[in-house]
């Protein structure tokens, strides 16, 4: 909109980067052979690599969803539109962590907080966003 200094436009580039990182980290953890000596037949256990990759992918997905939710919320705000009735509570929770942009501010910090809130809700540590509890 004219006169608006704040925008979520550049989230698209960052979201693409997050999707690429998710793809890279989601590759299977392989077992590389130890090539230190001809008689050495030990292998490196891939569990730690898989664990780190799972943590990274989880965080990237939270960040990607936070960017998507913030951008959708901003689109509604810029158009002076209300979300569908079934999404109102969700959008209110998104805006609690990422208010609509109407000027300059640290959007990265807000996205980080929103991603943290998504992660907490998914793990059942929060009732936000109307997500069902995991069993």
Annotate the PLM regions.
Residues 1-135:
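C-terminal auxiliary extensions adjacent to catalytic cores
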């Amino acid at each position: 909109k004219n006169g608006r200094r704040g925008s979520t436009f550049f989230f698209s580039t960052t979201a693409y980067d997050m999707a690429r990182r998710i793809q890279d980290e989601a590759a299977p953890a392989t077992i590389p052979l130890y090539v230190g000596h001809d008689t050495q037949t030990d292998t490196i256990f891939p569990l730690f690599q898989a664990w780190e990759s799972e943590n990274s992918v989880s965080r990237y997905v939270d960040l990607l969803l936070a960017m998507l939710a913030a951008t959708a919320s901003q689109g509604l705000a810029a158009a002076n539109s209300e979300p569908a009735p079934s999404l109102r509570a969700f959008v209110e929770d998104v805006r609690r962590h990422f208010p609509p942009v109407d000027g300059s501010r640290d959007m990265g910090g807000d996205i980080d907080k929103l991603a943290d809130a998504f992660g907490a809700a998914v793990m059942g540590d929060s009732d936000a966003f109307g997500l069902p509890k995991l069993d």
